[in-house]
Every structure is written in C-alpha cells, then in structure tokens.
Amino acid sequence: MKNIIKTIVAGGFIVGMTALISSCVGEKFHVEGTIGNAQDSVLYFEHNGLTGFTTVDSVKLDEKGAFSFAGDKIDNPEFYRLRIAEQIINIAIDSTETVKVTAKYPQMATEYDVNGSYENEKIKELALKQINLQTQCQALYNHQPEVADSIVEVLVQTYKEDVALNYIYKEPMKAYSYFALFQFIVVNNAARLIFNPAKDAKDNKVFGAVATSWDTFYPHSERGQNLHNITIKGMRDDRIA
C-alpha cells in the first residue's frame, strides 16, 4: 500500500528528464506574465516530473513583477509550476503555446488569471475546487472533530463524482484530467489522495480511463505507462482483496 501511494503521488506531481532531453530541438513553449506585490521575491519555474520537482529557471522580481520562462516542447503534456515560497500556480504544457499568467502575491495560488490555454483554465478550476475541499475538511476537524471523519467521507465522495463526471470522463486525454487524478487533501497532517486506486475499485476505473486515452493520444509516454502500472496494480490488489 505504501509503495503504490508513493508511486501515485510521485506520478502526479512528480516525466523524467529523459523525455525532456528527447524533445524536439528548437521548438519552445513560453510561460510569461506578472506577479504583483512581489518585489525582491524569487519566482521559481519548476518541472513536476515522475521522480520529483526540478528547477528549470528562476528570477528575482522587480517592482513590475514581470517574468518570462521558456522550455523545450515534448510530445505529451507536461506539468510545471510557478512558485514563490509556498504559493503555487500549476501549469500544464502540451504544445509550443504561450501561457500568460497574472497574479498578485501573497494570494497568487487562488487569485490568478491564466490566458492562452484552455487546459490551464481547467486546471485553475480544479485547483480552486481542491482548495475549497481542503478548507471545508480542515474546518470540520477544527470545530467538529467528533463527526469530522464521516462528513469528510461524504465531501470527498461528492467531490470525486463531480470531477470524474464533469472533467475526467469528458476529456480523459487532456492534461487537466491527468492533473485531477493526483489531487489530494491533508488530513491529520498526512496527505490523502482524493482518487485512490489502491483502496477504491471505482477510482481505479477512473485512472484506467485516462491511461487508455493517453495510450491512444500519447503512445509510449512515460506518464501513460505510469498510469497503466498504477491501474494494473489496483486491479491486482482488488482481486486479492
């Protein structure tokens, strides 16, 4: 159980540098914009690969807060983040697009605008939903600890039904659907996966839908293979149980 959770958490927000190295030379994507109220803060542009986070670039912001980062295009969607301290904006890249972000520190994680990318508009929606779920759960544990566990279960199930129906199953080939698979909340100082194929056969079917779709649209990608490994492990565990 611990091994699959580590694999899942790493897989979502964590493809290796091999894919980056093999990307098309010369073709670039761009992430640019402004972060207000962040003078002298260091803005990091980080790649979120299967094996962890790596810093692609960084910049010390001036009073205007302007930034511009670029990276090599690869053949499947990849995930990055803009970060100042603990404030994070998740970004998906699936082409040589230019993604424009405007935000204001220190609320950049929740109050930002992203333009030029349908995928990233959806990722913002999902990120805000996740933050709202986390806030509700934390409030329950703070103020109603005696009933928190049961109510949190209902909230999580409702969240999963909404996201699976209105996001993942609608467009399982999209980067935002992959992103949704690996969302989590923190309960009692421990990360809890929202979709957990190691514990719930229905969740494993959701993973399987994205894995199958990525096989079709992004054959031989490391992320697609990782999804398959997780799904197969979940099926085996379910049969054993």
Question: What is the predicted role of each segment?
Answer:
Residues 24-167:
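A non-transmembrane, solvent-exposed segment enriched in polar/low-complexity residues
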Residues 1-13:
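Bacterial N-terminal signal peptides that target proteins for export
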Residues 166-171, 217-220:
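Flexible helix-coil transition and linker loops at the boundaries of alpha-helical arrays
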